[in-house]
Amino acid sequence: LATSILSYIKTNETHSNWIICEGGDDKIYLDTILPENKEYRILPVGGCGNVVKLFNLLLNPLLIDKKERKEFKGKILCIIDTDETKMNYKFENLKDMPISLRRLQVFKSNNEEVIKLLDVAKQGTIYEKTEIEDCLDPQIYYNSIKTVILSSQDSNIIDLFNNFELNREKKFSKISGDDSLLLPNGNEAYRRKNELVSFLEKPEIKMLVAKEYSQESQSTNITHALAIEIIDYFEESMITVS
């Protein structure tokens, strides 16, 4: 797979930009939030471990052979979640490489929520569990989970969800934790919130929500902060390899 991607990027006449992501639901979100006039090839590979493996397989030939880099006609962005368990990644100097491994991170800067794609080799002090579902438009995501939950025929989850309301002060779509998109109405809802989070984290539910989000987004004209981060990465200039 790595050989095929490298070969395609080198032989394609126009710039070929690739995004390697974890899962099929990630691909749906990326297809949804990125503008149609930006042509990205988005490839889900089934989990963080596979993204990192493919990154290494793509990186090694570029580290070894300058000619390989010189023939590159595009860039590759590998995106992973920030998991609860902090991982330590060590890479050689990747400055001006046409490939990068970044982790999603939502955090507060000057009391404002921001999204960054942080280089995993430069961990820094900012580290909080983040996945793509935390980086979306809050109103559209709320509408999407509401539609999926009400269609689920799970009366316990429906009753529980009806005891929450949208936190309109949120800039993004994080559900878990106290700083959440969902505001509980009463102690029982607060106490049982993890049941709702667990339901929404089921793979089949995540996929349904992603598809619903894509549908909901068609009638809006919103620029997603994550999309801006991704576009900025691909538009950053690199020093030409001589």
What are these regions (language model features)?
Residues 33, 139-140, 144, 148-149, ...:
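Generic structural signal for hydrophobic core residues of well-folded globular domains
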Residues 27, 61-69, 139-143, 216, ...:
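Short secondary-structure junctions and interdomain/linker hinges
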Residues 74-201:
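Activity-critical C-terminal alpha-helical subdomain
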Residues 1-16, 27, 179-242:
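Nucleic-acid enzyme cleavage-core boundary/entry regions
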Residues 1-85:
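RecA-like P-loop NTPase motor core
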